[in-house]
Amino acid sequence: ANLDAFAHGGSTENSAFGPTKNSADPSRVAGGSSGGSAVVTALDIVPFALGSDTGGSIRQPASFNGVVGVKPTYGMVSRYGVVAMASSTDVIGCFTTTAEDAELVLEVISGRDTRDMTTLPDYFAPTALEQPLKIGLITECMTDDVDPEVKQATLKYAEKLRAAGHTVEEVSLPMLKHTLAMYYIIVPAEVTSNLARYDGVRYGRRASDIATLAELYGKSRDEGFV
């Protein structure tokens, strides 16, 4: 499916085929970077689709197109074969139309992969849940900035969990306000390192007979991906 090149973008405008149209309103963007995966899932072209999520590349287009988008916990799904963007936060996840379908997909794609040393053999084994559950509701995620419908749905489900006998407590994560700043320190540094091999300057294939730096980048990539 169409996506922003190297997962860099939030609209699929930085792609080989131009921006993907939103599944509900073609005048709007589908989101990104995995916008194409969200759209084909929303339009029932496929029962599910995969994507990568570093800083919202599954969750944002899923939200824009009204489907379920899951970024699994780091180490749950192998990243083998994925062109790394920022290795500390890159995760493979899925798009589906229901939460139940997302569970089925995650059961298939999760697990140990000897080609990815960050994966665990059975992610769910050490986290067997005892009933009743104790669930934290993050206060910083329930501010006035949250869409009222999303906030209402979350609080409604929290009450449903309480009625089922589970404990739901408000939990404060004061450092949450700093996460975006930390993201923009860590991710650009890792992107610079991971993608250095593709510019044809220091590592990898280097095109010849070039006149400008932009031409060096373009020809090196063209020759390397043929």
Range-by-range predicted roles:
Residues 11-18, 181-194:
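Charged, often glycine-rich, active-site loop that binds/positions anionic groups
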Residues 167-172:
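General small-molecule cofactor/ligand-binding pocket signal
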Residues 129-136, 189-226:
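Short helix-loop capping/hinge segments that flank enzyme active sites or metal/cofactor-binding pockets
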Residues 1-107:
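Short glycine/serine-rich loop segments
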Residues 68-157, 210-219:
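A short helix-breaking turn/cap at a secondary-structure junction
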Residues 164:
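Conserved dinucleotide-binding and phosphotransfer motif residues
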